[in-house]
Amino acid sequence: MEHDQSAQLVKMANQIGSFFQAQSPSDAGAATQAIAAHLKSFWAPSMRIQLLRDFDAGKTPLLMPIVASALRSHRSTLLPAP
């Protein structure tokens, strides 16, 4: 069950990544910022935490590089306030 949830989160994150990468094809920085902002605004904290945990554990091999970059670059924004 956990694998299915992880795969679904990766699929959704990649869809977001594809959209924002197409919006800013020559500006990866803008795309990663937009991806992170979208995840922060529209994903529940539990979803963001799970995606980051799976990413840290190496369980997201199908994650698009632009999404992985967004997770690395904007990690502190994606985590809920303590």
Language-model region placement:
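A domain-level signal for the structural core that forms small-molecule/cofactor-binding pockets
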Residues: 1-82
